[in-house]
Swiss-Prot record:
It comes from the Eukaryota. Residues 666-675 have a biased composition (Acidic residues). Residues 649-661 have a biased composition (Gly residues). Residues 1-52 form a transit peptide. The lineage of its organism: Eukaryota, Viridiplantae, Streptophyta, Embryophyta, Tracheophyta. CDD domains: ASKHA_NBD_HSP70_HSPA9. This is Heat shock 70 kDa protein, mitochondrial. One of its GO terms (cellular component) is mitochondrion. One of its GO terms (molecular function) is ATP binding. It is found in: Mitochondrion. PROSITE patterns: HSP70_1, HSP70_2, HSP70_3. Belongs to the heat shock protein 70 family. The gene is HSP1. Keywords: ATP-binding, Mitochondrion, Nucleotide-binding, Stress response, Transit peptide.
Length: 675
């Protein structure tokens, strides 16, 4: 193979510390964090037996879903609110309590700056990324620069990585599965958009680790949907059109004899329902400004109300031709309160979002071209993601592929079900299915002149391994820098940098003479390992790619501890609510008994009961569960004296020797309710 000249590096004296700054996996004896520490990590107070189930999780931008195999079929699990999907929303209230899912979404209007949604769009992204800067203008919460240059978010004055926010959602999902299965869960298959790059896949895996999950496999969302569609012996060439809350993917797969082979994939990781909501939001803000001369964009509370109204209107217009957006008291000026009342037709909505829908066409055409097939070769088009319920989207899909899309899968649940099927394959429970996925973007290195030299082209089936020999760019060069890139542009600077490392100790020689073998290895998760080896000395340097951002093991360890702390606080808060509910029920029963028997018991007994109830009420206003429990026990003990005094019979006064005939009064009508 003709040696290609590596980009020239300025020669410098390397100390051993600068070499060790790169993560070298060779010679490392450190046990994998995920398999050693976190595989067994569950909530420290869980009394459930350990399970071996591998759950399937669709960690979505807007909503998330969890499924588990029951026999040969995947089953979607309902959460504690009785819903089959959970909003991917995390909030911190004024007491810094963590809320996840529906409770977090419900309070967003009154707490917009501390309610975090759509953070999947930031996962694995740099703060300076153009898409991050665009997102900053659209959300009410703060997006901040992390010490490593990544995009993080801020709530209640504390900074969180998007992986951490994803971990809070994953923990809620994990608990949903544990409550259903009655055992602890430590293994999962988690889905990602097919067009996620290496940094985004790594960050998703980190989210699983923080949540105490050993992520057995990262699987592409369209592929997972095809798995759930094809599990019932469906065959043919399938196109999966996946338009979700934050991302768009299209994949072409061939299903034959239980083998699911991805032919090509394409997409846009910044196109989804959030953008449709934002387009409608901008329209509502401009309309109100036109009619009332008030700019609602400066009012975060009003914006959050508008955002929720926009999402509701978008959903309604999928089944009706027009809807009313009615928000009373949205603002006020010197003349008084102002109300927003707009009638929105489906055609107007379609006009507002037409440019977004048009953006799905180019990836579909590229995908067909990469798969080397024509439209007529496609047997079925599957719709995945909530946004595919929009009639205009369905119309455009029909135009692109020349046929009406299939309604063969549930757009909200198919991805999680496919992930559960992949979990069944990994466990060995599902033997008749085989999945062959692809890498969505080309991988290579920067060579002399800033050129991007590909080693692995996009849509290569994974896992895969590819090597190529390079050489030095200068005489007597004793080290080379390997800069790893991902993308489709010809110049290195225009592609996504995944990381870089140095190969040192090359014997001095004329330029072009040393033989340096660079090897790319992509695993089944789509995660990249790169090695460089000097063929003359056998010296090798190897890294699992981490971008200059990303989370270190120490940061993940710290976030795991924070997650445990939040879990403990959640448990303590639940215990406090339970004991308050118990106390409330007991007070009702005690007061009922006291009212019924007050005339038949001594005044000092009645006073003792009243004082005990008063003390219990005072304790209930506090935050100390142990104090409430003690006061509840005291109140129950006090009210038990009613039974003792009534056991003397209907004659009235207390009697030393128990009942002397007559009807014995029952024990006081109180009960302690355990919830």
């Amino acid at each position: 193979m003709a040696a290609t000249l590596l980009r020239s590096l300025q020669r410098r004296n390397l100390s051993s510390s600068s070499v060790s700054a790169f993560r070298s996996l060779t010679g490392s004896t450190k046990t994998s964090y995920a398999t050693h520490k976190l595989a067994s990590l569950t909530r420290p107070f869980s009394s459930r037996p350990a399970g071996n189930d591998v759950i399937g999780i669709d960690l979505g931008t807007t909503n998330s879903c969890v499924s588990v195999m029951e026999g040969k079929n995947p089953k979607v699990i309902e959460n504690s609110e009785g819903a089959r999907t959970t909003p991917s929303v995390v909030a911190f209230n004024q007491k810094s309590e963590l809320l996840v899912g529906t409770p977090a979404k419900r309070q967003a209007v009154t707490n917009p700056t501390n309610t975090l949604f759509g953070t999947k769009r930031l996962i694995g992204r740099r703060f300076d990324d153009a898409q991050t800067q665009k997102e900053m203008k659209m959300v009410p919460y703060k997006i901040v620069r992390a010490p490593n240059g990544d995009a993080w978010v801020e709530a209640n004055g504390q900074q969180y990585s998007p992986s951490q926010i994803g971990a809070f959602v994953l923990t809620k999902i994990k608990e949903t599965a544990e409550a259903y299965l009655g055992k602890t869960i430590s293994k999962a298959v988690v889905t990602v958009p097919a067009y996620f790059n290496d940094a985004q896949r790594q960050a998703t895996k980190d989210a699983g680790r923080i949540a105490g999950l050993d992520v057995q496999r990262i699987i592409n969302e369209p592929t997972a949907a095809a798995l759930s569609y094809g599990m019932n012996n469906k065959e043919g060439l399938i196109a999966v059109f996946d338009l979700g809350g934050g991302t768009f993917d299209v994949s072409i797969l061939e299903i034959s004899n239980g083998v699911f082979e991805v032919k090509a994939t394409n997409g846009d990781t910044f196109l989804g329902g959030e953008d449709f909501d934002n387009a409608l939001l901008d329209f509502l803000v401009s309309e109100f400004k036109r009619t009332e001369s008030i700019d609602l964009a400066k009012d975060k509370l009003a914006l959050q109300r508008l955002r929720e109204a926009a999402e509701k209107a978008k959903i309604e217009l999928s089944s009706t031709s027009q809807t009313e957006i009615n928000l009373p008291f949205i603002s006020a000026d010197a003349s008084g309160a102002k109300h927003l009342n707009i009638t929105l037709t489906r055609s107007k909505f379609e006009a507002l979002v037409n440019n977004l829908i048009e953006r799905t066409k180019a990836p579909c055409k590229s995908c067909l071209k990469d798969a080397n097939i024509s439209i007529k070769d496609v047997d079925e088009v599957l719709l995945v993601g909530g946004m595919t319920r929009v009639p205009k989207v369905q119309q455009v899909v029909s135009e692109i592929f020349g046929k009406s899309p299939s309604k063969g899968v549930n757009p909200d649940e198919a991805v999680a079900m496919g992930a559960a099927l992949q979990g069944g394959i990994l466990r060995g429970d599902v033997k008749e299915l085989l999945l062959l996925d692809v890498t969505p973007l080309s991988l290579g290195i920067e060579t002399l002149g800033g050129i991007f030299t590909r080693l692995i082209s996009r849509n290569t089936t994974i896992p895969t391994k590819k090597s190529q020999v390079f050489s030095t760019a200068a005489d007597n060069q004793t080290q080379v820098g390997i800069k790893v890139l991902q993308g489709e542009r010809e110049m290195a600077a225009d592609n996504k940098s995944l990381g870089e490392f140095d190969l040192v100790g090359i014997p001095p020689a004329p330029r072009g003479l040393p033989q340096i073998e660079v090897t790319f290895d992509i695993d089944a998760n789509g995660i990249v390992t790169v090695s460089a080896k000097d063929k003359s000395t056998g010296k090798e340097q190897q890294i699992t790619i981490r971008s200059s951002g990303g989370l270190s093991d120490d940061e993940i360890d710290k976030m795991v501890k924070e997650a445990e702390l939040h879990a403990q606080r959640d448990q303590e808060r639940k215990a406090l609510i339970d004991i308050r509910n118990s106390a409330d029920t007991s007070i009702y029963s005690i007061e009922k008994s006291l009212a019924e028997y007050r005339e038949k018991i001594p005044a000092e007994v009645a006073k003792e009961i009243e004082d005990a109830v008063s003390d219990l009420r005072t304790a209930m206003a506090g935050e100390n569960a142990d104090d409430i429990k003690a006061k509840l026990d005291a109140a129950n003990k006090a009210v038990s004296k009613i039974g003792q005094h009534m056991s003397g019979g209907s004659s009235g006064g207390p009697s030393e020797g128990g009942s002397q005939g007559g009807e014995q009064a029952p024990e006081a009508e109180y009960e302690e309710v355990k919830k």
